């Protein structure tokens, strides 16, 4: 797998640190953000292959952040990690269970499910 950079966003510092450690141990570079504003600042300052939103963010914040990311970079997938997958956040590209093994299995699948959608293109200015 080529080197991947992920943006992980959530309000719970412990969950965010744990998720970041899991991703780093799997070879990802991880930038973490504790708020929508911090996430947007990070997102516009560098390229990310994927954005991972934690269920600890309120739904309206997940939605707002997803739309902002897709407006800036339509081909960057946004996934929501949740305690239980029952209802899809219709704005997200995927929702997955909050299990490290599932997260690590699903990221490559999401990136390869529609390669033409997620191929890197320059971010909009």
Summary of predicted features, one role per range:
Residues 25-26, 72:
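Conserved dinucleotide-binding and phosphotransfer motif residues
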Residues 3-14, 19-23, 51, 79:
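Conserved acidic segment of CheY-like receiver
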Residues 1-13, 85, 100-125:
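Non-catalytic signal-transmission and effector/linker regions of two-component phosphorelay proteins
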Residues 53-69:
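Conserved phosphotransfer microenvironments
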């Amino acid at each position: 797998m080529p080197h991947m950079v992920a943006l992980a966003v959530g309000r719970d510092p412990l969950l965010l640190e744990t998720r970041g450690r899991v991703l780093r141990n799997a070879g990802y570079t991880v930038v973490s953000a504790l708020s929508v504003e911090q996430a947007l600042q990070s997102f516009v300052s560098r390229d990310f292959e994927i954005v991972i939103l934690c269920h600890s963010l309120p739904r309206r914040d997940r939605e707002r952040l997803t739309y902002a990311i897709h407006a800036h970079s339509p081909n960057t997938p946004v996934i929501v990690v949740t305690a239980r997958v029952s209802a899809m956040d219709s704005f997200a590209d995927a929702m997955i269970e909050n299990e490290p093994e599932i997260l690590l299995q699903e990221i490559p699948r999401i990136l390869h499910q529609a390669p033409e959608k997620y191929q890197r293109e320059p971010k909009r200015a």
